[in-house]
Amino acid sequence: MASWVLSECGLRPLPRVYPKPRTGHPLLNSNPTKLRFSRTDLGNGSSFCLSSGILREKNWALRVSAPLRVLQVEEEEENKEGERVINGGEEFDPGAPPPFKLSDIREAIPKHCWVKDPWRSMGYVVRDVAVVFGLAAVAAYFNNWVVWPLYWFAQSTMFWALFVLGHDCGHGSFSNDPKLNSVVGHILHSSILVPYHGWRISHRTHHQNHGHVENDESWHPLSEKIYKNLDTATKKLRFTLPFPLLAYPIYLWSRSPGKQGSHFHPDSDLFVPNEKKDVITSTVCWTAMLALLVGLSFVIGPVQLLKLYGIPYLGNVMWLDLVTYLHHHGHEDKLPWYRGKEWSYLRGGLTTLDRDYGWINNIHHDIGTHVIHHLFPQIPHYHLIEATEAAKPVLGKYYREPKKSAPLPFHLLGDLTRSLKRDHYVSDVGDVVYYQTDPQLTGAEKS
């Protein structure tokens, strides 16, 4: 898709050449004299108001929503091509433009799925925080090596659940109150050493450009040129377990290969000037949490702190890397990545994957319902299952039913291992590309 017309969040495809990300609200970079938007209500609680290019109220919610309209001519051309693939009896091509529009998916989702209930959202926060402190109290009380491994798994999962709730605050799906979202988001994310605004802004870039080779932000593919310029040690670390599952803290400080910037520094390429204060606020909160942990180590001892917090923190990082990677990689069929005019918000979003985590689904707030979340991030997590079921008839083969999990999702480790062995880089040329394999890294035949 060449361009998108938005009436809520100003979402646009970023330029093909992206040396310095422009991650602020795209409308702020336009001619201010040409911007005269009034408040609009989309029926899902999201609204904003611009006049002469100046926001009338500050909203810390992650300003990413699905585009409401696309150019009709391009839309019709893509629909016809997709219909030929699906209805013409040919083998399904996941890279073909879909025979439906984003609005078709939206219309299939019940209206109540868009409603945000702050009391219900806060209920999940209270539940998770209570479980976190309860687990820590039980582990500290028994303090034996039968309990500790069980505690580490359970607590790392709960830390990850806290991250997901903070993630919802960043999207604005937690509530319609931006101040409530910001306060709760800072508390939850700072408690697990995540800079709330810094991450929120980069995650916005990810959603705005999902499925784009260069412009996507997290777990995007390496181009062949960048990949071949990596030294052997870096390649091994990136594609050999468990190292990819420990990447998140490094990503916060230095991002992915081929990109520069830090989630902590207000002058990073990730941010635009009007976001500096938010980034500084989050970095201060992160520093305060780190200072609190240092002080706590003098009270209970560094070994006890490592057992109560340090190991669960690392487990949380592994959960985060596992889940976020597998929502965009690891399907048994190779899925496309896009560039240039072949990329569109809809086509990029349809490359995402749902995953089943068994008993963990409810604990981490159904984050596995990822396709609809990526297309419509303003839907609260507690409505995503219903919204997904309603959208499936429209999505057809573009929705890939996740493999049913056992109580614990050990099967996903197989998907992860397979992907790390085969998904190494994409071609430097072409607007629809697929992962290729480096035979020198794995000993496999090049694909």
UniProtKB/Swiss-Prot annotation:
A motif (Histidine box-2) lies at residues 203-207. A motif (Histidine box-3) lies at residues 370-374. It comes from the Eukaryota. One of its GO terms (cellular component) is chloroplast membrane. Its EC number is 1.14.19.-. It is found in: Plastid, Chloroplast membrane. GO terms for biological process: unsaturated fatty acid biosynthetic process. The histidine box domains may contain the active site and/or be involved in metal ion binding. Pathway: Lipid metabolism; polyunsaturated fatty acid biosynthesis. Belongs to the fatty acid desaturase type 1 family. Chloroplast omega-3 fatty acid desaturase introduces the third double bond in the biosynthesis of 16:3 and 18:3 fatty acids, important constituents of plant membranes. It is thought to use ferredoxin as an electron donor and to act on fatty acids esterified to galactolipids, sulfolipids and phosphatidylglycerol. It is a peripheral membrane protein. A motif (Histidine box-1) lies at residues 167-171. InterPro entries: FA_desaturase_dom, FAS_N, Fatty_acid_desaturase. One of its GO terms (molecular function) is oxidoreductase activity, acting on paired donors, with oxidation of a pair of donors resulting in the reduction of molecular oxygen to two molecules of water. Its main location: plastid. PANTHER family: OMEGA-6 FATTY ACID DESATURASE, CHLOROPLASTIC. Transmembrane segments: none annotated. This is Omega-3 fatty acid desaturase, chloroplastic.
